[in-house]
Amino acid sequence: MKKLLSMLCALLTAIGLPGCDYVNVKELQPGVSTAVEVRQRFGPPQHEWRNEEGSVTWEYSRQPEGAECYMITIGRDQVLQSIEQVINEQTFARVERGMTPEQVRRMLGRPASSQYFQLKQETVWEWLMERGSTLNDPTYFTVSFNPEGRVVGTGRYTKLRP
């Protein structure tokens, strides 16, 4: 039964449904699980970030529909070092004025959307923070970039449902 659930989760993840992320994360163990096991559970990463000490961080963003982005770090020995869900208040607080789009993407993963505002001369990226439910509306975290590609501010808003 456990093997069937794992296979179903892998299939759903491969087609972009994050419903099994909870199970996948719980069954992976830093210091024990291998890069092969991570790929079996999560599929290929959307982006690979090379780290100075030789490890690699794989990005698994569930944006725009999901409110998760997993940064999974694999050591040079091909063993899982860490799994971090980066769509959270601690990571948002690390976004600073003057950062580049690449630095922000490295911290938060692929944004749910990007929009250019002609009058303000700003590009705004947004990430879904909370999906919302029948009682709550979805909430987004935003990062604004100036024409030089530097962070000029952050914010959040709630998208009211009709």
Question: Which role does the model predict for each range below?
Answer:
Residues 1-18:
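Sec-dependent bacterial lipoprotein signal peptides
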